[in-house]
Amino acid sequence: MSEQEQKQEQPIENAAENSAQKPEEVTETDVQTEQNVTDPLEEAIARVQELEEQLADAAKKEQDALLRARAEVDNMRRRAEQDVEKAHKFALEKFAKDLLNTIDNLERALATPANVEDESVKGLFDGVELTLKELLATVARFGIEPVGLVGESFNPEFHQAISMQPTEGFETNQITTVLQKGYLLNSRVIRPAMVMVAA
């Protein structure tokens, strides 16, 4: 083969080699392009998942806040109802405390020794007794009841002990003497009974 023929064949072989190499290069470029295309797609999918998680967290927080707000409203409503109920139930407390002095005075008047044989004194005595009974019946209708009777067990919630002394016929912590009656308004102490207790 002549040199010229060899030179002509070499470009053909080189061209064949170059063309064989080019598909490899194109393939690598195509793969890189596909990876570049895939990467933004994967990034977008990852971003969507991240945003969905954030949205789910935000929805959960909003749901929690809504439940807390509802609970707070229910608590406020319940407290308001209780306040109104207490206001109705104990609205008479101050008035009742003032009435207790009148009841005490009427009871003292009846406890005072008097000549009941005298008709004028007997009529007055009967009138005071009827007035006291009517007053006690009226206050009882409004939930006011006396507490602290001789013979009851001492209870510090309802009674105030003035003194303790050994007394025959009474067990320890039994009320022996009531110095001033106590009263409850709807089971709430408005005045404790002042008592003497057996030791």
UniProtKB/Swiss-Prot annotation:
Annotated spans, Disordered: 1-43
Gene Ontology MF, one: unfolded protein binding
One Pfam family it belongs to: GrpE
Entry's Gene Ontology cellular component terms: cytosol
Principal localisation: cytoplasm
Gene: grpE
Chaperone listed as a keyword: yes
Family statement: Belongs to the GrpE family.
InterPro entries in the cross-refs: GrpE (IPR000740), GrpE_coiled_coil (IPR013805), GrpE_head (IPR009012)
Keywords: Chaperone, Cytoplasm, Stress response
Compositional bias of kind Basic and acidic residues: 1-10
Protein's name according to its UniProt entry: Protein GrpE
Organism: Actinobacillus succinogenes (strain ATCC 55618 / DSM 22257 / CCUG 43843 / 130Z)
Record function comment: Participates actively in the response to hyperosmotic and heat shock by preventing the aggregation of stress-denatured proteins, in association with DnaK and GrpE. It is the nucleotide exchange factor for DnaK and may function as a thermosensor. Unfolded proteins bind initially to DnaJ; upon interaction with the DnaJ-bound protein, DnaK hydrolyzes its bound ATP, resulting in the formation of a stable complex. GrpE releases ADP from DnaK; ATP binding to DnaK triggers the release of the substrate protein, thus completing the reaction cycle.
Disulfide-bond pairs as recorded: none
Subunit-level organization: Homodimer.
